[in-house]
Amino acid sequence: MARDTISTWNRSQVDEDAMGAAHAPIWRRMIDVAAPTDLSRSTVLDYGCNQGGFLRLLYDRHPFRSAIGIDIARESVARAELLKGHRPIDYRLGDQAAALGQTFDLAFSHEVIYLLPDVAAHARDTKTALRPGGAYVAAMGCHTDSSLWPRWRALIAESSSIPIYDHSLEEVSKAFTETGFSVSVRPLALDAFMPFTIGSAYFPKVVDQLRYYSSDKVVFRFVRVP
């Protein structure tokens, strides 16, 4: 069931606009570990595209044939359209990939699954939108297996315009397996320096940040079984 649209995901416009730069090292790592080098004949979907930064980065590194990014945030999608330049990307309002009426070779999402009430429904929707053998790469650090989640849940709830949900890594794996995907997973294992802020609400200690980016944050690869 499609959800109502919103203006922006983050209630703070300043924080909303800052997300792209903050997420760029993570996106680069996702691309490094999960994106094929040659995407020249591939169609790509970005689920929860926000202001469109991931697909712009992906195209600049590995040009694809075409891509669609979907999101329920109206202002973010409009911003993504303004920023896409010459790239063959179409940003649209929505949260149902199947409603796009086409199939994709590759799909991505970054920190989207914890914002969805029904993981199994998301798996079914993704399956409809992927060609047989196509892959969905989903990065996820907001899950109940992370020791930081109780703290983060409260913090994110203060800024998110939509509800957040408690999903475990096992729950996500089970939902996609039962929907007809082969499931594999690895730690993101970020290989970049990340700024540390003394007194950070999200990372009280340096070791919290190190653990999060080395083990808590994972990258799933769901391949639609032919």
Model-derived features: where do they sit?
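Conserved class I S-adenosyl-L-methionine
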Residues: 1-38, 41-50, 57, 137-159, 197
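Class I SAM-dependent methyltransferase SAM/SAH-binding core
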Residues: 51-97
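A conserved beta-strand element that flanks and buttresses the S-adenosyl-L-methionine
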Residues: 108
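A short glycine-rich, Lys/Arg-flanked "PGG" loop and its adjoining helix->strand segment in the class I
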Residues: 120-132
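A C-terminal cap/extension of S-adenosyl-L-methionine-dependent methyltransferases
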Residues: 151-154, 184-226
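Acceptor-substrate binding/catalytic loop of class I
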Residues: 154-171
